[in-house]
Amino acid sequence: MKKLLIILMVLTAAGFTGCPHTINTTKESKLTDKTYSIDGINFVMKAIHSVRDGMLGADNQSDNKKHTVSLSAYRIGETEVTQELWKKVMKANPSYFSDKPFKGEIQRKRPVDKVSWYECIAFCNELTKKTDGLGEANCVYYSDPAFKKIYTKEDAKSTARVFQNMDKKGFRLPTEAEWEWAAKGGAKTKWAGTDKPSDLKNYAWYTKNSKNITHEVRKKEPNGYGLYDMSGNVEEWVWDGYNEKLPESGEQDPIGDLYSQTRAVRGGHITKESEECECAHRHDSAPGTKGYLRGFRLACRP
């Protein structure tokens, strides 16, 4: 009896440690991946369950030390947004890498690049409008704080201020915390999919294997959540205003610095060294810039 009591005490204590807890409500138990189609172009959004006290950051990152966050359930793009999807929605392909794909790869399935943060915002709304089951009523981004005026392509051209309504279920940019949690893939690995430098070539296109060009998505191994290219190919815009100091541990669904003049960028790219491809690595860029090594991936509420 005494031995049983000790075991029960140990198990009870274990339930109150700092380990992350996936919150599986009845509703979330039905949360699954979802495939969308826009005029024959399919893309997959992977389901990520909510988490309490999930560990992000790393000790070797000066602007992203270890800290915990709690996140509501969400979906995130299996891949970076491709050139074919961007062109279908926006009627043009702005990419620097718009021709001469690597041998055997399909040009239209390379990630879109050379897009500003504002243009990504407009794209998310345009895609939401075109998606069956969503439509304009589910657009996330607005040009006014009362959420009356849908953010448009014209707003993006004028770099108008963006207001985000996270209660909407349309497509959007992931937050930094959502992006990093997804990149880790349910593990504690340094890169998306692996903790071994020698294995990084199997998961990411970066300086040692890219030949300085972007590549068709889904050509490398996925991470634990079934996501591709989160440590390489193109780096990715996220929603958050950048601040060198992240919020204290314990925040629920953090969205970044509302007054920052720059936006956070995540993930490695084809000319980055391995250190800059780590899941916890972060930097920033002015939202109006159009880097030829920068794209994005989608997120949405389930």
Regions found by a protein language model. Give the residues of each.
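GGW-centered surface loops in extracellular recognition modules
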Residues: 25-47, 162, 168-171
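Sec-dependent N-terminal signal peptides
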Residues: 4-12
